[in-house]
Amino acid sequence: MGFTEKQEALVNASYEAFKQNLPGNSVLFYSFILEKAPAAKGMFSFLKDFDEVPQNNPSLQAHAEKVFGLVRDSAAQLRATGVVVLADASLGSVHVQKGVLDPHFVVVKEALLKTLKEAGGATWSDEVSNAWEVAYDELSAAIKKAMS
């Protein structure tokens, strides 16, 4: 069974909940990443010169919005065509340049899900989590393919 209309709607609704507090949720997202992988700090230009995740940082917020938006867009692609095609062909080379490895994708996935759970509150469910996981896994597979 392919990605359903309901799954896409769940992703879209929780993405909107995430965006309602973009500054706070962005800090939360990168805090979760650094909690699991402190060495990843150097991969992000907006983090490498700070001891802690900076508050109200436009670059940090823009990158978080881009990451979550790419996963949301992947859900839409999965619903429409059943496959994820990268709109930005440079994503693979950027990830290679930054030294991203397979374990980093796992850390980001966990941080993304934890952030969405916090943002979604009572609306979070296994069904919402599963929809995001499928979309994220397909996006990360497309990025990894572009990295090789």
UniProtKB/Swiss-Prot annotation:
Positions that bind heme b: 45, 66, 95, 98
Keywords: Cytoplasm, Heme, Iron, Metal-binding, Nitration, Nitrogen fixation, Nodulation, Nucleus, Oxygen transport, Phosphoprotein, Transport
GO BP field: nodulation
Tissue expression summary: Stem nodules.
Cross-referenced InterPro entries: Globin, Globin-like_sf, Globin/Proto, Leghaemoglobin-like, Leghaemoglobin_Fe_BS
A GO MF label: oxygen binding
Function: Leghemoglobin that reversibly binds oxygen O(2) through a pentacoordinated heme iron. In stem nodules, facilitates the diffusion of oxygen to the bacteroids while preventing the bacterial nitrogenase from being inactivated by buffering dioxygen, nitric oxide and carbon monoxide, and promoting the formation of reactive oxygen species (ROS, e.g. H(2)O(2)). This role is essential for symbiotic nitrogen fixation (SNF).
SUBUNIT field: Monomer.
Protein name: Leghemoglobin 3
Species this chain originates from: Sesbania rostrata
